[in-house]
Curated annotation (Swiss-Prot):
Pfam families in UniProt: YcxB
Name of the protein this chain belongs to: Uncharacterized protein YcxB
Keywords (A to Z) from UniProt: Cell membrane, Membrane, Transmembrane, Transmembrane helix
Organism name: Bacillus subtilis (strain 168)
InterPro entries from the UniProt entry: YcxB-like_C
């Protein structure tokens, strides 16, 4: 049931592996480009220091092209391997974390965002909120402690409730980093 207090909203539900995985992929997409460029720089530096291997004889331009392609392919492979290792670590951490999988209720009011469960009760005041992002199926609320609050859209019972959530966020936060779907292109 939707429960409306004067200026609050309650969102009960359980966070699934699919919800957390979506946040993981949004975060990993940003850092994967960095790792790819880092591996390219490392492989280029190694090739430059050790000398370029002679893959094609007779054409320096073709040899340089082939070495560049080798660097790109190796960088892609190492980046994918690193991302796979991070994903395995992430999925194991989720499976072991009972707190993450437990049923919870998010309450947004004038105080801040309260997360209640059988095992814990957390309150994040509005001044702790540094950014809010809306993705396809989830909201990510960043906090000043470097953590984030993931609120899946399936916790909302209607579009009206989701709009009230956005209004409460806009009214109570001073952060300029609010990116709701209408703002994203």
């Amino acid at each position: 049931m939707i429960q409306y207090a004067s200026e609050s909203i309650n969102l009960p539900g359980e966070i699934t592996f699919k919800d957390v995985r979506e946040i993981f992929f949004y975060q990993i997409a940003k850092i994967s480009c960095f790792y790819f460029l880092l591996f390219c720089a490392i492989f280029a530096a190694v090739n430059f220091i050790n000398g370029w291997p002679r893959i094609v004889y007779g054409s320096d331009a073709l040899n340089l092209f082939m070495n560049s392609m080798l660097i790109i392919v190796m960088s892609v492979l190492f980046t994918l391997l690193l991302l796979l290792l991070l994903y395995v670590k992430f999925s194991r951490a989720y499976k072991k974390n009972e707190r993450m999988k437990s049923k919870r209720t998010y309450t947004l009011n004038q105080e801040g965002i309260r997360i209640c469960s059988k095992k814990y009760d957390l309150i994040f005041n509005w001044d702790e909120i540094t950014a809010v992002f809306e993705y396809k199926n989830i909201f990510r609320v960043n906090t000043s402690s470097g953590q984030y609050i993931a609120i899946p859209k399936h916790f909302f019972h209607s579009e009206e409730e989701m709009n009230r959530f956005k209004e409460i966020i806009l009214k109570n936060t001073e952060t300029k980093k609010l990116k709701f779907k209408k703002d994203q292109h």
